[in-house]
Design a protein with these regions (language model features):
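Aromatic- and histidine-enriched alpha-helix N-cap/loop-to-helix transition segments
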Residues: 32, 103-113, 124, 162-170, ...
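Alpha-helical scaffold segments in carbohydrate-active enzymes
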Residues: 114, 135, 194-205
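Extended, hydrophobic alpha-helical segments in both membrane/secreted and soluble proteins
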Residues: 167-178, 191, 195-199
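Extracellular/oxidizing-compartment recognition motifs
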Residues: 1-99, 111, 127-130, 143-152, ...
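Alpha-helical support elements that line or immediately flank enzyme active sites
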Residues: 37-42, 110-139, 175-182
């Protein structure tokens, strides 16, 4: 893959495919995020012409555009921006709220808060928000505070050994916002110990004057 830039090449979704038997039907096993696809034939037999036909892609998301609530009383350009933004959110709505379908596909605690707020105003899919909250709580650190990031595959685990102060501080607020939007008290009770642990963890970074210490042990 020829490219420019400094982003890790592991995030570039390129693929080398060998067609051993032709004609035939082939399906690529990975999930991709793209607007355009470039196909380059590197080598083929001299015994005939090579062609691809019937190419299709299957879109996957837990977001349902039939439930999408468009912005009300806005200009046409604002409505268009809102719809594109909702489509971006939909692409990140998989089994949890991913930080992006083309990047490392992690569930990040800070991204989750923004995505949840956007979901409440558009799709109102409380299930994917709830599952995401349970994931960061289920992969909590030893002190009970929520995970900063979570990988689901190949096995669900805490994806970052260090914590971001802002993200940890947001978790109790996210639980409150979820309750206000969904009315799901049982989930709040389940997450309450993690929310309290998040508060305790944040307070360890605050000095006697109420200011956050620079050497607080948090990442970033």
């Amino acid at each position: 893959c020829e490219r420019l830039g400094t982003i890790s090449p592991s995030w570039v979704q390129d693929e080398v495919v060998n067609f051993d038997f032709v004609p035939g039907m082939y399906e690529l096993p990975r999930r991709y995020a793209f607007r355009y696809v470039r196909i380059r034939v590197k080598q083929c037999s001299n015994g005939g012409k090579f062609c691809l036909k019937g190419i299709s892609a299957r879109a996957v998301s837990s977001g349902d555009f039939a439930k999408y609530t468009p912005i009300d009383g806005a200009s046409e350009i604002d409505k268009a921006i809102d719809r594109v933004s909702a489509a971006t959110l939909r692409d990140s709505m998989q089994t949890c709220l991913e930080d992006g379908p083309k990047r490392d596909r992690r569930l990040w605690l800070g991204d989750l808060r923004l995505q949840a707020l956007a979901d409440y105003a558009t799709f109102r899919d409380f299930d994917v928000v709830k599952r995401s909250l349970y994931l960061v709580a289920g992969c909590a650190f030893e002190d009970g505070s929520p995970a900063t990031a979570v990988y689901e595959k190949p096995q669900t685990r805490n994806a970052n050994g260090r914590q971001i102060l802002d993200y940890t501080a947001l978790f109790p607020l996210m639980v409150l916002e979820y309750y206000k939007e969904s009315g799901d008290r049982q989930t709040v009770e389940d997450l309450w110990p993690t929310a309290k642990a998040a508060c305790r963890k944040v307070l360890t970074a605050v000095d006697e004057t109420g200011l956050v210490r620079e050497d607080n042990g948090f990442w970033n």
